[in-house]
Amino acid sequence: MTKRALISVSDKSGIIDFAKELKNLGWDIISTGGTKVALDNAGVETIAIDDVTGFPEMMDGRVKTLHPNIHGGLLARRDADSHLQAAKDNNIELIDLVVVNLYPFKETILRPDVTYDLAVENIDIGGPSMLRSAAKNHASVTVVADPADYATVLGELADAGQTTFETRQRLAAKVFRHTAAYDALIAEYFTTQVGEAKPEKLTITYDLKQAMRYGENPQQDADFYQKALPTDYSIASAKQLNGKELSFNNIRDADAAIRIIRDFKDRPTVVVLKHMNPCGIGQADDIETAWDYAYEADPVSIFGGIVVLNREVDAATAKKMHPIFLEIIIAPSYSEEALAILTNKKKNLRILELPFDAQAASEVEAEYTGVVGGLLVQNQDVVAENPSDWQVVTDRQPTEQEATALEFAWKAIKYVKSNGIIITNDHMTLGLGAGQTNRVGSVKIAIEQAKDHLDGAVLASDAFFPFADNIEEIAAAGIKAIIQPGGSVRDQDSIDAANKHGLTMIFTGVRHFRH
């Protein structure tokens, strides 16, 4: 009996050659719509779908393959006599191979001019149904949704006249992933359209971006996935201009770096980061000076660090960066001369280019944190804060220079691991206390790091001070200005201690824990 294939594809890459090879192997081909036209024009003889179903394509193509003559031919078990008899009794011919890919829903909704009606019309119904029927019956039917699998299928058909069970099973699994992701994307689109903030089912889909050598540690397997609807301002979308493949830890650090730099838009700014904590932030009127400040903030920790700059990297800045061992440099652009300098004898230095004009859109993306047996979902900590809403709670008001420095410190503290303390002046970080289990411990570490640069320095805390001992440590170091959320039942103790030492202290009313 002549074997039959059903081919209906929106992505026609490689399909002509595939179909010609099938014909050479003696297969009959059923086809639909535009696919049939393309195959016929290429000289590949096909059977029209309506010759199989006995019904014409109708309703603008919405109904063409949803018919027992199609799904019976796909779902009939070859090892079940009752199935084969039912097919014979109803004049249903078996279909042994399905090649289908789906309407371009993703590509459609990514179009800037897309309308709701156009999106709806690009929801495929018949395609997923055929794929799922064929995949369910993979014991007998081969199903292909990806042109990358054409060669494998043709090779096995040419060698043995049929595909192996292992191949059919693998392709079926791939199809079920494919249709699930397709439906998840549609669900995500409709959830957004109706404004459902807390859906009872969370369906999101990601595409494999990079198979990784290992994860956070060599004993951990890992892979990198990108959202099916890509975020332009993300490490997944960054253009790599030089260097080795990004590692798992590289990606996490780089992601933290581009989140930090988002908050520093107004002036040229450089952020240096290690282990997801900023170890140096500098800002100035030009990017070269901003680099100088970021480097001076911690010239030891910068070794092997990640650097992100919010302005084009020029030659002068590149010359200063080049001698230092860095893992990654990220910027919106690089001058031709700067790129030549940075890549000279630095084949492993990872250099990324990222569209900073897409930052705002990235802020609305949810954050997902895996826990054993579950997933936490929250919006990002990107609340707009206005210094005019802050409250000076001490007798002394901040000076103009202190006010500027406190704003700078408050931006920086958001990205320090809790319990987080940061000491800065008005243009660079000076000391960092991160990740301690008690706040006074973080205060002491930050002061120790900044001890030679405390003149005119200010201090920020990501959460309230639970006891006045923190204020005593800060005052003893000579720091005169503090910014913190407030909110402790012992706030008054901290205020009294600050007043006793002539400090100025601001309460913002907003906490910035980072775990």
From Swiss-Prot:
Its EC number is 2.1.2.3, 3.5.4.10. Pathway: Purine metabolism; IMP biosynthesis via de novo pathway; 5-formamido-1-(5-phospho-D-ribosyl)imidazole-4-carboxamide from 5-amino-1-(5-phospho-D-ribosyl)imidazole-4-carboxamide (10-formyl THF route): step 1/1; Purine metabolism; IMP biosynthesis via de novo pathway; IMP from 5-formamido-1-(5-phospho-D-ribosyl)imidazole-4-carboxamide: step 1/1. Keywords: Hydrolase, Multifunctional enzyme, Purine biosynthesis, Transferase. GO terms for biological process: 'de novo' IMP biosynthetic process. It catalyses: (6R)-10-formyltetrahydrofolate + 5-amino-1-(5-phospho-beta-D-ribosyl)imidazole-4-carboxamide = 5-formamido-1-(5-phospho-D-ribosyl)imidazole-4-carboxamide + (6S)-5,6,7,8-tetrahydrofolate; IMP + H2O = 5-formamido-1-(5-phospho-D-ribosyl)imidazole-4-carboxamide. CDD domains: IMPCH. Residues 1-145 form the MGS-like domain. GO terms for molecular function: IMP cyclohydrolase activity; phosphoribosylaminoimidazolecarboxamide formyltransferase activity. One of its GO terms (cellular component) is cytosol. The keyword Amino-acid biosynthesis does not apply. It holds the Pfam family AICARFT_IMPCHas. It comes from the Bacteria. Belongs to the PurH family. NCBIfam families: PRK00881.1, purH. The IMP cyclohydrolase activity resides in the N-terminal region. This is Bifunctional purine biosynthesis protein PurH. It comes from Streptococcus pyogenes serotype M49 (strain NZ131).
